[in-house]
Amino acid sequence: DRDVTGVQTCALPISLIHAIMGLNRLSGGTVTWDGEIVSNLPPNQLCQRGMALVPESRRLFTGMTVRENLELGAMHPAAKKRRAESLERVCELFPAVRQKLSQASGTLSGGQQQMVAIGRALMALPRVLLLDEPSLGLAPAIVSDMFRVIQTIHQEGTAVMLVEQNVSRALAISSRTYVLENGRVIAEGDSDELANRPEIRKAYLGL
């Protein structure tokens, strides 16, 4: 489905998203993508099938330039062919990135680094984008900009899975939400409906 799916996590968010992306082996269950069981496939094969991950804390190569970090996202053959086009699209989504292409990524602010991390994932031409805590450690104004871009990415046809502890933000932009606690799904459903459940409002929204 071409949806934004929000996952509000109280524990084990990294294990969840890493298992989906093939970075951790599953101890049970399966991951199905496009009707195919892809459990425990290596990340490079999942990337070629249309998945891309924006990891928590960005994980940029800080000694490399912004351009070099972005181009690392376009490693599989289909993405390499469209590398210049994809780079231009990233710069359209994040105008500040265009001005920093020749700068070492380690000199950027946290918000700018997050832009580069999202841009790097988009360079892989994903059909589904997995984001792990994209708002972590960012100023409120930057968070607002980041979520607007995530909405734009979705509107252009990319499905999004968002692991996020900022519950109000996640509910606002997602169509479906899963609430995890200690590795178990304790609530799921339409995001608008979940946002109006008294127990969710009390436990996660402070209302």
Give the positions of each predicted feature.
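Glycine-rich phosphate-binding loops of nucleotide-dependent enzymes
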Residues: 11-207
